[in-house]
UniProtKB/Swiss-Prot annotation:
GO molecular function list: rRNA binding; structural constituent of ribosome
Name of the coding gene: rplO
Region described as Disordered: spans on this chain: 1-66
Compositional bias (Gly residues): 28-38
PROSITE patterns: RIBOSOMAL_L15
Cystine bridges: none
Regions of compositional bias (Basic residues) in chain numbering: 39-52
GO biological process per UniProt: translation
Physiological role: Binds to the 23S rRNA.
GO CC terms of this entry: cytosolic large ribosomal subunit
InterPro entries in alphabetical order: Ribosomal_uL15 (IPR030878), Ribosomal_uL15/eL18 (IPR021131), Ribosomal_uL15/eL18_sf (IPR036227), Ribosomal_uL15_bac-type (IPR005749), Ribosomal_uL15_CS (IPR001196)
Protein name: Large ribosomal subunit protein uL15
The entry's keywords: Ribonucleoprotein, Ribosomal protein, RNA-binding, rRNA-binding
SUPFAM superfamilies given in the database record: Ribosomal proteins L15p and L18e
Amino acid sequence: MRSNPMTLRLNDLKPADGARTQRTRVGRGIGSGLGKTAGRGHKGSFARKGGGKIKAGFEGGQTPMQRRLPKIGFRSKMARDTAEVLSYQLDKLDAGDVDFVALRAANLVPSRAKKAKIVLKGELSKKFVLKGVAATAGAKAAIEAAGGSVEE
């Protein structure tokens, strides 16, 4: 039986030319073109086993940036212990006396905070008397404009 050249058979299947190439074997003699240094060049960290893996910030022995530049600033422990309460959040409370305990009871101050400070943002519609709670100059003016007062 003669086969049609257009008939596809399993024994005729083969990958396209150039689709499957053998991996390049390096370091197998100078005749291969990739012997001796195996394409890694001469000496240096990249020629070594595990080479090229350098720590972030390593500058080749030069004093690194994080050691050349001076230390600046600090993280204030007072800021960590002081909670900011925005003035419009006070409207959630009933008008009258407001102290640290009342702010914590209304979940306006996290449990880790030791102090609270009122910061101006938004409008105040109720009359509040702040006791033992700090306030910014703008917040103080807004509280007094609404008929309240600040007693530190």
